[in-house]
């Protein structure tokens, strides 16, 4: 059914890292027969906490990938990192996919599977522990990962909510 292409990692002149996660062959059934096409899923990151996801469809693979990359660039969001990892543990969800993302100590590396690994690599995360729970559909896993990252809050945001200083929060 769905074919996953090997992930490619490119860096363009604008300093953004691009990674193709999957390319699927899709079929539209019409009165005259079947129309074949391709759907591509990509992520783009700036290596400093910026991440964007895009999907594109077309009759040819390169056009689908290009559309996906353009959408990913438009949807770029910034996530706060702390020394190449995250501030706290978080769970993200999309559809039947749930992801658990935990900060890791220096030297751990990226311990995450498939689509999540691609997201962390283009973001510039060096140390993270992540687990995919439920569906492993690449689209849902990437959306769940970004959902979890959007839920992440910095110590300064938590301190502002509680009306305390950052030192009280970080201990």
UniProtKB/Swiss-Prot annotation:
It comes from the Bacteria. GO terms for molecular function: rRNA binding; structural constituent of ribosome. GO terms for biological process: translation. SUPFAM superfamilies: dsRNA-binding domain-like (SSF54768), Ribosomal protein S5 domain 2-like (SSF54211). Keywords: Ribonucleoprotein, Ribosomal protein, RNA-binding, rRNA-binding. GO terms for cellular component: small ribosomal subunit. The N-terminal domain interacts with the head of the 30S subunit; the C-terminal domain interacts with the body and contacts protein S4. The interaction surface between S4 and S5 is involved in control of translational fidelity. Part of the 30S ribosomal subunit. Contacts proteins S4 and S8. Belongs to the universal ribosomal protein uS5 family. This is Small ribosomal subunit protein uS5. The gene is rpsE.
């Amino acid at each position: 059914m769905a074919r996953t292409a090997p992930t490619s990692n490119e860096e363009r002149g604008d300093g953004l890292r691009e990674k193709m996660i999957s390319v699927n062959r899709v079929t539209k059934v019409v009165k005259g027969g079947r129309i074949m096409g391709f759907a591509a899923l990509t992520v783009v990151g700036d290596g400093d906490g910026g991440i964007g996801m895009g999907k594109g469809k077309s009759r040819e693979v390169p056009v689908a990938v290009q559309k996906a990359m353009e959408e990913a660039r438009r949807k770029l969001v910034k996530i706060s990192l702390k020394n190449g990892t995250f501030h706290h543990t978080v769970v993200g969800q999309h559809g039947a996919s749930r992801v658990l993302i935990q900060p890791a100590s220096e030297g751990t590396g990226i311990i995450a599977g498939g689509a999540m690994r691609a997201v962390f690599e283009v973001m510039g995360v060096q140390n993270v522990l992540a687990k995919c729970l439920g569906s492993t559909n690449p689209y849902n896993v990437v959306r769940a990962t970004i959902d979890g990252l959007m839920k992440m809050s910095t110590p300064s945001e938590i301190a502002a909510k509680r009306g305390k200083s950052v030192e009280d929060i970080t201990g």
